[in-house]
Amino acid sequence: MVVLKLTSRYPDLARAAIVGGATHRFATTHYMQGMEIFYGKGMPQGQLTDRDLDKMASDAPGMVKFYQNMHHPEQKDYWRTFLKGVWPMWTTPTSLTEEEVKKIHIPVLLLDGDRDEFFTVEEVTQLYRLLPQAEMTLIPGSGHAIFQTPGKTPLFYALVLEFLQRQLPKAS
């Protein structure tokens, strides 16, 4: 969502964009169900407290492990800082209109897993149809975090690299 908002509001900011596991609409039923499964029932909205994070860790230990695997082992509690920073954005309703999406005139690579826990294939396809220069790739057997799905990491990076190489100006 952040990349989409920035490229819609500041069209000259980038020459290309990569959007993984996202759509232009916020808080669909599928999204909210995914959030509850991953973070636990009764998720707070807005700013998180330490008590909220303790409850999440108790209700969803797999979520803690997921974030710990993303960061350096010496920063095993960084997930708390990370979630405190992004949680308000992830839980505050915000969407882009179709008109705002259509303003994005740079090449956009949409990457998503066909088993994404937060965004359906149909939702990502809607976004694909609105973006004038979009490319869409669905990774079979992958969830939301494609780069952490066993066996899918090489494919994820190969797709990203190939897309970026095509966007670079030709060397003379």
Question: Model-found features: residue ranges?
Answer:
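Flexible "cap/lid" loop of the alpha/beta hydrolase fold
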Residues: M1-R9, L13-D59
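Active-site phosphate/pyrophosphate- and oxyanion-stabilizing loops and adjacent acidic/basic residues
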Residues: L4, T125-Q126, A158
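Short glycine/proline- and acidic residue-enriched helix-loop micro-motifs
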Residues: P61-D77, T81-L83
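Active-site nucleophile elbow and catalytic-triad environment of alpha/beta-hydrolase enzymes
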Residues: K84-E100
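Short alpha-helix in the alpha/beta-hydrolase fold that links the catalytic acid
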Residues: T97, I106, T120-R129
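Short beta-strand/loop motif that positions the catalytic acidic residue
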Residues: I104, L110-D112
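Acidic catalytic loop of the alpha/beta-hydrolase fold
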Residues: R115-F119, A145-I146
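Catalytic active-site module of serine/aspartate enzymes centered on a nucleophile-bearing elbow/loop
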Residues: A134-S172
